[in-house]
């Protein structure tokens, strides 16, 4: 939209990490482009790209973090709240170990927000991520809560976030395990009402498994009897 030239390299169009090292790929692309956005898997890949590219490298998504989504989510919460962000509370419920849970925790800490994570303890962010969030919160005044009680997590919040229960690249076999662990963390009308806030908003980075109108959604319904998974 702004007139810049862009090139998309899909996985099959690049030999990065396969026949060509990440370091060499970074050096070549850095000579050809003014900036690079990477969307893939390991955080260590984008960090190596950034080390050797010589141009700005943006994180479009890794297993661990999703900062570009955070820009959109922070803007959305600011636009749809009558309060400044440092007076706003939000909750993330579901599997909090991956990029969305990690990133929302750090985002809220950096912006001085009231951040709630509602998830089984085994699906909380890593100890390192939690420690980093608490360290930032000491500087910004953010409030951080991690709880296994979904209703406690959403009480009084303005926004309820969630994400898919099975992430990119994970096998179908993990669905049953996640459903067993997370069935009490589905975002339902009842959970929204538990916020006690009639103006509470729901947020999801998408795509969401919220009905049977996709192949995966229909397979989940036929296999597990769920019409919608993380939200319904």
Swiss-Prot record:
Known outcome of mutating residue 88 to I: In strain: CCUG 17915L
Keywords: Amino-acid biosynthesis, Arginine biosynthesis, Cytoplasm, Transferase
Residues that hold carbamoyl phosphate according to the record: 15, 39, 66-69, 204-207, 232
Keyword hit for Ribonucleoprotein: no
Top-tier EC class: transferase
Result when mutating residue 174 to A: In strain: CCUG 17915L
Catalytically driven reaction(s): carbamoyl phosphate + L-ornithine = L-citrulline + phosphate + H(+)
GO CC annotation: cytoplasm
A single MF term (Gene Ontology): amino acid binding
Binding annotation for L-ornithine: 99, 163, 167-168
Function noted in UniProt: Reversibly catalyzes the transfer of the carbamoyl group from carbamoyl phosphate (CP) to the N(epsilon) atom of ornithine (ORN) to produce L-citrulline.
Protein name: Ornithine carbamoyltransferase
Originating gene: argF
């Amino acid at each position: 939209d702004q007139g810049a030239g862009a090139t998309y390299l899909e996985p099959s169009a690049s030999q990065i990490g396969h026949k060509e090292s990440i370091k060499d790929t970074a050096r070549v692309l850095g000579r050809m482009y003014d900036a690079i956005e990477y969307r893939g898997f390991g955080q260590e890949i984008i960090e190596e790209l950034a080390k050797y590219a010589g141009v700005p490298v943006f994180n479009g998504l890794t297993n661990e973090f999703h900062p570009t989504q955070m820009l959109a989510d922070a803007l959305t919460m600011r636009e749809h709240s009558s309060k400044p962000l440092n007076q706003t509370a939000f909750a993330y419920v579901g599997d909090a170990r991956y990029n969305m849970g990690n990133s929302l925790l750090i985002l809220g800490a950096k912006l001085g927000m009231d951040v709630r994570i509602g998830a089984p303890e085994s699906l909380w962010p890593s100890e390192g991520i939690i420690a980093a969030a608490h360290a930032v919160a000491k500087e910004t005044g953010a409030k951080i809560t991690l709880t296994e009680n979904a209703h406690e997590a959403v009480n009084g919040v303005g926004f309820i976030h969630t994400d898919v229960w099975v992430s990119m690249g994970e096998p179908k076999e993990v669905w049953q395990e996640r459903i067993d662990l997370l069935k009490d963390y589905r975002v339902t009308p009842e959970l929204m009402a538990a916020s006690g806030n009639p103006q509470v908003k729901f947020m999801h980075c998408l795509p969401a498994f919220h009905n049977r109108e996709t192949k995966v959604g229909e397979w989940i319904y036929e296999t597990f009897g769920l019409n919608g998974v993380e939200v319904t």
